[in-house]
Amino acid sequence: MIKTFPLNSRAKTTALKQPKELFSFARDIDGEYIFDSTKVQDENLSYYYLPDASVDKQIDLGAGYSNFKKIPEEENLGDFPALLKGVMNYEQSTGTKINSDIITFRGLMTKILTLPYNLKDPLDLHVIVYDGQLFIKNNDEIELKRRQQNNQHEDPSKQEMMKKFEYSGYKFEAVSTLPKPWGDCSRQLIEKRNKKVVNNYEQYISVVKTGIGKVKLLLAGEVDCLWDYIPEDGKDILPHYVELKTSKVIEAPGQVVNFEKKLFRTWAQSFLIGIRKIVYGFRDDNLILRNVEVYNTEEIPIMLKDTINVNTKIVCMNALKWYGAVIEWINNEIPKDADKSWSLTYDPGSKSFSIVELMQDSELRNSVITEDFKEWRISLHKTES
């Protein structure tokens, strides 16, 4: 039986629980995961450093493209076993189950939050019920097919340019960050950043406890770097994180609308896990970095609301009310007392947002809920009883 949710639904309030980081983990250059939080922060968390004098040198964000160490598409999808390993490690250290209704990746919640202003983008997710919680993941099979189809239908020259645009984002991250605080880095290390081989294997992932309305969420999201320092004595690290982005320099009124859409998505992904600062590098068509702007996440809704483009105005509060309503609906409609799996989809053609129970789900469940995680939760409940 299909259950549908009206797209015009809105929650009365937008009470978002203040995100709090529970733990972090990382993926290294070899694609291996590291779960020791202290080691992860010391060795896998970068620091932002890009003075105006460096920007004035017109950095080429396309340099080194031919040497790009890119992770294969099929390996660069949200890794649920890695997330569950992190959850398991955290629960073992506290001796208690994390109190969340939904466990998922920030990127998937970003898609749901921004849906009112991205009605042309399809959504295909799986919801696996286990131990009274909803584990939401991407439908990787459909996602990979969609990417392959898009590549097949695109002009090869345009496809190559899109790859270079993608690369320029990783290059910007490489030239604007340091592996240690500025004072601990040699002049040579700072000045040779432009020569560094760029990769998208390395990731630092923050896992935060948050929520909207009465629904409690655990979200895992990649963090690009720190603005300043790691606070001592276990104080909140989230205000120190930074999101890095690149975009084309704005030279015509029509480009403003495109940038506002991009800024809205960046606001959503930063807001969801409590990142308060966003740095945009603006490049020209030749991938030369022209200027850098710093935005405070909390100010973006006001900027978007004050836009002169009335027909394309994005209201973040409207998106939040949708998000609150749809997350509550998902949480209420999917029974948590039976270990089943569901398909959660948005179809742009029919404009329908729906969930349907999956009958043949054993392979899916086993690919998400690992044996180690099951054994841990069983042993945890035994000690509790």
Curated annotation (Swiss-Prot):
Going by the entry's taxonomy, the superkingdom of the source organism is recorded as Eukaryota
**UniProt-listed Enzyme Commission number(s):** 3.6.1.-
Sites where the protein binds a divalent metal cation: 173, 224, 243-244
Question: What molecular function does GO assign, one term?
Answer: nucleotide binding
Query: Which InterPro entries does its entry note?
Result: RAI1, RAI1-like_fam
Q: Where does substrate bind?
A: 222, 245, 269
| Enzyme class, broadest EC rank | hydrolase
Q: Which cofactor does it need?
A: a divalent metal cation
Q: Where's it found, cell-wise?
A: Nucleus
Record keywords, A-Z: Hydrolase, Metal-binding, mRNA processing, Nuclease, Nucleotide-binding, Nucleus, RNA-binding
Q: Carries keyword Manganese?
A: no
> What does the record note about the cofactor?
Divalent metal cation.
Entry keyword Ion transport: no
Q: Which GO terms describe its cellular component?
A: Las1 complex; RNA polymerase II termination complex
Q: Catalytic activity, per the record?
A: a 5'-end NAD(+)-phospho-ribonucleoside in mRNA + H2O = a 5'-end phospho-ribonucleoside in mRNA + NAD(+) + H(+); a 5'-end (N(7)-methyl 5'-triphosphoguanosine)-ribonucleoside-ribonucleotide in mRNA + H2O = a (N(7)-methyl 5'-triphosphoguanosine)-nucleoside + a 5'-end phospho-ribonucleoside in mRNA + H(+); a 5'-end triphospho-ribonucleoside in mRNA + H2O = a 5'-end phospho-ribonucleoside in mRNA + diphosphate + H(+)
| GO biological process, alphabetically ordered | cleavage in ITS2 between 5.8S rRNA and LSU-rRNA of tricistronic rRNA transcript (SSU-rRNA, 5.8S rRNA, LSU-rRNA); deadenylation-independent decapping of nuclear-transcribed mRNA; mRNA processing; NAD-cap decapping; nuclear polyadenylation-dependent rRNA catabolic process; positive regulation of termination of RNA polymerase II transcription; termination of RNA polymerase II transcription, poly(A)-coupled
Q: Which family does it belong to?
A: Belongs to the DXO/Dom3Z family.
Subunit info here reads: Interacts with RAT1; the interaction is direct, stabilizes RAT1 protein structure and stimulates its exoribonuclease activity. The interaction also stimulates RAI1 pyrophosphohydrolase activity, probably by recruiting it to mRNA substrates.
Q: What does this protein do?
A: Decapping enzyme for NAD-capped RNAs: specifically hydrolyzes the nicotinamide adenine dinucleotide (NAD) cap from a subset of RNAs by removing the entire NAD moiety from the 5'-end of an NAD-capped RNA. The NAD-cap is present at the 5'-end of some RNAs and snoRNAs. In contrast to the canonical 5'-end N7 methylguanosine (m7G) cap, the NAD cap promotes mRNA decay. Also acts as a non-canonical decapping enzyme that removes the entire cap structure of m7G capped or incompletely capped RNAs.
Name of this protein? Decapping nuclease RAI1
Give the gene that encodes this protein.
RAI1
